[in-house]
Amino acid sequence: MKYDIIIIGAGPGGIFSAYELVQQNPDLKIAVFEAGHPLEKRHCPIDGDKIKSCINCKSCSIMSGFGGAGAFSDGKYNITNAFGGTLYEYIGKNQAIDLMKYVDDINMKFGGEGTKLYSTAGTSFKKLCMQNKLTLLDASVRHLGTDINFIVLENLYAELKDKVTFYFDTPVKTVEALDPGYRISCEDASYECNQCIISVGRSGSKWMEQICKDLDINTKSNRVDIGVRVELPAVIFSHLTDELYESKIVYRTEKFEDAVRTFCMNPHGIVVNENTNGIVTVNGHSYEGADKQTENTNFALLVAKHFSEPFKDSNGYGESIARLSNMLGGGVIVQRFGDLVRGRRSNAKRIAEGMVEPTLAATPGDLSLVLPKRILDGIIEMIYALDKIAPGTANDDTLLYGVEVKFYNMEVELDEHLESCHKGLYIIGDGSGVTHSLSHASASGVYVARQIVKGNE
């Protein structure tokens, strides 16, 4: 079977590539290959009753399937060049913002209308942060919520399913360069195309690395972010979340001058497990619907680690720390902040007596046995710094779940069109190492679709 264009990965980059290609040229013969399930079949078996922890499904419904890892996220689209990737370095700052706004318009068209667009513009919290050695990054944030985000994806799939051929539960094994075009091989068949877009996300990092080796595409080591997910009463951060929803706050530690940042803030949200390459880490979700909201807010505190020669395996470093947590706790570990600073392990009794009711069934433990001292010291410093702008953050009963790890793909060598050294082979989204967010990944998909159509004219 031969197609004009094959897209590998049905995450945000792949979806928006397919959408824009159809808009630009409805006559194109397009196929999308996805290792995971269709959206309606993506169900995590963890129910909190019979199954309380990850059972390592062959295809993780949280990380893979139509919508990618973002399908069950809280649907935050950050419209900014300040964080979320370096797409602007390839296509220019103005065009990057314009594409993110275009993605926002599409999300509104397909079910997101009525959701709020938050902005840091003119906020007094910027000054408050500066007065306490913190930096609030500028951004506009569209919060869809996990529930509305799911509806948008349903509607996008309904729009595309009769115009694009989808192959679900069909992992691609290899990508072979022909002259011209490409051949992709799956377990039972091979397919050819004139042009290929690879958009495999962070969960496809190991696969992407192998493909780059096979095709002699240059890469360079990126980074890994390691930290914890903080859970506390929603009222403590309500003055920030009511106005900004998500605040990206950065602190530079006193001793090591490491940057510690807040990430993925979920007002009235829940803490969840996440499975990456068989390793269980922690994440957070939130919902737009009031009936699904909790009394807690959660967010990540992350320390970015960049490595120099000779070490190149930043993701392997993060995985080893996450595996240690899994070994000690059988999955995710939870600890009271008060216990952490006193050097003692948390137990179920002290957590149950605290004022924060956990939203994830995790194993009480001691994070100091898991996280490197430099990272843990930075997190503790950051919590005390946040306590100055949100009093109560450093309460003894504040819960810390570990570990949270954000893996980044090796950064693939691409030109200004996001095209590799092989003509017609484009690599986009988080799988490229260029983007690290829903908005940037989606925008990269739109951009490449337009580049392909323009180049084929």
PLM region spans:
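Residues forming the flavin
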Residues: 1-81, 121-123, 127-457
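Dinucleotide-binding Rossmann-like beta1-alpha1 core, especially the glycine-rich loop
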Residues: 65-115
